[in-house]
Amino acid sequence: MNGPMSRPVPVTGEDLDAELASSVEPLSALGQFNRAGILAAADIHVARALGRLGRDDDELVGLAVALAVRAPRVGHVLVDLSTIRETAVAGSEEETDPANLPWPSLGLWLERVKGSPLIAVGDDGPADRPLRLVGSRLYLDRYWQDEQDVAVDLTARSSAGAPEIDEAVLAEGLVRLYPLDSSGLQRQAATTVLHRLLTVIAGGPGTGKTTTVARVLALVAEQAVETGRPFPTVALVAPTGKAAARMAEAVHDEARRLDIREAVRGWLLSLDASTVHRLLGRRPGTATRFRYEGHNQLPYDVVVVDETSMMSLPLMARLVDAVRKDARLVLIGDQEQLASVEAGAVLGDIVGPAATTGRPPPHVYPPIGRCITVLQANYRFSGPLAELALAVRSGNGDAVMAVLDAGRSAGRNALEGDSNARWLDIDVATAQSESLEPVRSAVLTAQQLVADAAQAGDAPAALDALGRLRLLCAHREGPTGAGTWNSQAEQWLAGVGEGPPLEGGWYLGRPVIVTENDYGLGLFNGDTGVVIAEEESGLRAAFRRGAGVVSVSPARLGAVETAFAMTVHRAQGSEFDEVVVLLPRASSRVLTRELLYTAVTRARRSVVLVGTEESVRSAVDRPVARASGLTARLWG
């Protein structure tokens, strides 16, 4: 019978969390970990369900399983039972020291876990268990399999040589295409691409990682020209549509300038870029199954991945499975930036010890070391901004504060001055209007340039102006979140007659960011645009597409948000003339060294940190350490 009483009642995520939490006995060990905010009720629910299926009700095993379930949720690939007591971070509002929770002794814990029917022991243990223990590292089995697959694939590629090349052609090309490479590192990276099937090019912003792609590909193409072979097939990919578009743009811009044959130039200009998901051909209705995989591999001779730091371990596993074993794989990125929002810190794990040595001596380290080059020279910015980025990356709080103290700002002219790394020492969460006047002034000044160009219908000028300033936030919501600061910017604009006379949320000069890929419009998650006036069609949203501009009716845009401010995560892969970083309080768990470094290095010319010294030091002193076994597998 279908009637009002038979209709299902919608259950929200909060309802489900509350329901699961009510089933956790508060005085049990698991209940104490739940109250401390280390384990979510869902972690415990899954652990108990697995225990029932495996007929194992040992509470120590249940705790280990719940922590392994939790691990990917907070970015880890595994839980290391030998260190979790020191590395766990309590997440409740109660002042709970994780060290005071009822942790079992390691010896007893490992003994119980090894004896559980739920858990395979060792890399060669049974394949039919949901979890696997390797040493003290406990994995959900699929993450162990992904890590194993990536390690085996990259080790094999690093040990294999690429097809034979003409060394004389390469030598001449290196001199011609890298005339200013005083360190020799860019030439080293290019040589690796030609000689090996795996190349990793790492380094900070402005070190020439992306622009060197065109030169490397030109060298590969010149080998084909000299031997009469066709040009290689190439896939340029990145984790997001925005990063892919920037990669293609960089390759095309560089191709127009290079001293190369016209045939090679035309070939480079014909290359396009896509997201990794689109390259692999994601199957509808699933995030982990793709058209291309081990039994149906990609047809490309060279696969180049930019912004590799944003890739999760599962996605990297799918990619290496799909790339032909005789194809060249080139991974590019900054291992110090924010890692994927999902499990793993793949690029950092791969680079490993090479992060501090540039390239390890071949007689000391395994084959992976011969495939890695860490670029050092910065061509984008200098002065205090470069000093600040280096100090943050190094975790030197005193050096960070020394740079900021030299550029300390106060009063109405706080965002002016000679230093390109400045500091507005206020608590963002409670700041009053007067103390925020410097930020308000900067937003209004920058937006006036956008609005003037938008009113004139000059889309390129409006988009150029949009890249002059961006507010960056650690959070999406809350008093220091991007949502709050977008609203604040609109209020400031409304106060001077420039802001929303709102019509469905659209107004002249509104900056917007796309939040979902729209392949029909050719717009991708992370693309930014601006609303301009067009004589015949009224308001249009203008976006860059390659070297040109495309304008779209606002009615056709669904998944967009206002973008005076954005999260640091969303800003990855982008750069602006000036960024204003609005820091949360020191207690924020997302305030990390990697987040601050990523925020600071979005600036081309200058950065302003807005926040207290406590917040700055807290970020610098809180590096992200994601639990993983990939470095150990690759480097030994």
Positions of the model-derived regions?
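N-terminal pre-Walker A segment at the start of P-loop NTPase domains
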Residues: E167-G184
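ASCE P-loop NTPase helicase motor core
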Residues: R187-Q188, R196-S409
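Residue-level signature of catalytic and energy-coupling elements of molecular machines
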Residues: I84, V150, T240, T275, ...
